[in-house]
Amino acid sequence: MKKHLCAAPECTGCLACLNVCPKHAIGVTEGFLGEILPAIDEDKCVDCGLCDKICPSLNPLPMYPSMDCYAAWTKNETDYVSATSGGMATAISKSVISKGGVVYGCAAHGLQVKHMRCATMEDVEKLKGSKYVQSEMGDVYQALKKDVLEGLTVLFIGTPCQVAGVKNYLRQEYGNLLTVDLICHGVPSQQSLHASLRHAIRDIEPTKVTYLSFRNHVKGDFCLECRGLKKDGKPFLFERGIDYSNSYYPTFFFGNSYRNSCYQCRYAYRQRISDMSIGDFWGLKDEKVHREADNGISVVLVNTDKGTAFYASMQADVHSHRQPVEDAIAGNAQLNAPTRRTGRTRCFRFLARYCSFETAFRITWMDRILKSRMKYCIKKIIRK
């Protein structure tokens, strides 16, 4: 591998370039935090230029101002209870499946998080839950294009940069493709997650991880949970909330461990790349809606005529309350600007170039770690 495409700090890792290359001349390398970066093998490259033509960083797509905003949640009680917000990703996916379409979304397979094709309601169950890590796209591009060209209704759900990758890969608009982007704060690499878990769970066997979850309403909403078998065959259960006893959540929630491109994200604004955008409705002011929904509420931003028509078609499946678009924008930082590089973030990223993920975390957050441990010790003494 001898050269990169767009500048590495601008690369979103969508890998549309890798999938479009007719000579398989593009492979993958890793940055210092494990983020995936495409690299061209010049011995195989024939300079056809396809990779340059479909790169979203080199060829920006038009963005859409949100037309309507809704506070919404699914009417399916089972889906609502197991949802990490209002269950709207599941509701939209099931609506597409019920109409004979297919869905491409993100699922956890052990410790591997990747996009997959779903053609049944049972498949959609695998997509449930937030994944605070960048998913692998794999060969999703080719499969999605085949479905689109065959005339199936196709739903793609992903981060805005993944949506941009899909759109540029297809190179034209298709009426039977519906895109939904997740309002995104930034994505750490899967290697960052693995490094954090390897430190926390001694002798973890990645191939024998049976369950991975990033949110759990019963256990305090934001809870990193991992279950499986160690190398010696003994079972383990790992659970951590947003505290400083584990490195993953602090570095994620405070924006230390994202891709470089996340700090200059062109999609972290009120103009959106997709037909619809969904996420947590942090800025909701309607108290009546708060009282009506007891588990979680999604924000649904409808950005195109196609999105409007589809959302109207699924009203029987959801509770939906129109809200001012400005409420959603005011309450969600990532609808206003990309995540900032704070002093701690700069410190963490500098250290991570020269030492392990865990060491960089412990040095960067030493004051908070010590404070957290002191609180724990004091509480333990008081209980006695």
Region annotations inferred by a language model:
Residues 101-103, 152-158, 177:
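Generic beta-sheet signal
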Residues 1, 43-150, 321, 326-362:
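Flanking helices and flexible, charged tails adjoining ferredoxin-like Fe-S electron-transfer domains
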Residues 3, 10, 16-39, 49-66, ...:
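Iron-sulfur cluster-binding cysteine motifs and their immediate structural context
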